[in-house]
Structures are given as C-alpha cells and as structure tokens.
C-alpha cells in the first residue's frame, strides 16, 4: 500500500527563479503542485509555453495573465486553466503575489 506524502510548504526546498522569485514543488507519481512567490524585483514571468497542462490559482495579491492572446486580471482565489502548448505570461500587480500551479505531467525542469 502506498503512503501519503504530508508536507509543509515552507519546508519544501526553495529554488530561486527569474530575478528574485521563489519556486517550491511537491510531486506525486503523475502530478506536480508548485508554490510560486513573485519577488519584489520580478516584473514578469516571460511569455513561454510547455507541453504540460497547467492550472494556476492566485493565493495572495493579483496578477495579469496573458494566455493565448487573451488578457485577464486575476485576484485572490481566481485562476486559469492553460492547455498544453499555449503561450502565456504573468505579471504580478502587487508585492508578494503568490500562486499555486498544478501540472500534468510533472515538469522535470522544475525538479533540477
């Protein structure tokens, strides 16, 4: 029988990304959850795409999302579902903006 993986977000290994943002991840066999905190000097998560399904939810602050050419402002408890291979970017609109992202399959690049 497989066991549950209990964790505390603040105890997950922190990885510095972009200029001064922080990424923490936890994985299961097929899925990944990332906890992303925009740093005070990070002005944008540049436009990119990947083969993973992604669902993101704002948990603190607000963010301007551009997904497939469509722009929306997301506030706390609002989110977006991004299909695979669709270009997207995120711009934090408040200091300390945080998001939780769910990925399928696991993003191996986030584990490095």
Question: Which residues make up each language-model segment?
Answer:
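A short, N-terminal "cap"/entry segment at the start of jelly-roll beta-barrel domains
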Residues: 1-30, 112
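Conserved short histidine dyad/triad with adjacent acidic residue
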Residues: 19, 34-49
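Short strand-coil-strand connectors
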Residues: 29, 66-70
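Structural motif
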Residues: 32, 42, 62-64, 87, ...
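Short, conserved beta-strand element in jelly-roll/cupin
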Residues: 38-39, 49-65
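Short acidic-glycine-tyrosine-enriched beta hairpin
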Residues: 70-84
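Ligand-binding loop in jelly-roll beta-barrel domains
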Residues: 84-109
């Amino acid at each position: 029988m497989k066991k549950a993986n209990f964790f505390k977000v603040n105890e997950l290994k922190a990885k510095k990304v972009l200029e001064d943002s922080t990424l923490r991840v936890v994985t299961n066999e097929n899925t990944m959850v990332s906890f992303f905190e925009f740093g005070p000097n990070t002005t944008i998560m540049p436009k990119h795409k990947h083969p993973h399904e992604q669902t993101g939810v704002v948990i603190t602050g607000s963010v301007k999302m551009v997904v497939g050419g469509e722009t929306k402002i997301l506030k706390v408890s609002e989110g977006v579902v991004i299909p695979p291979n669709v270009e997207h970017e995120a711009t934090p609109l408040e200091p300390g903006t945080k998001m939780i992202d769910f990925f399928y399959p696991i993003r191996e690049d986030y584990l490095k």
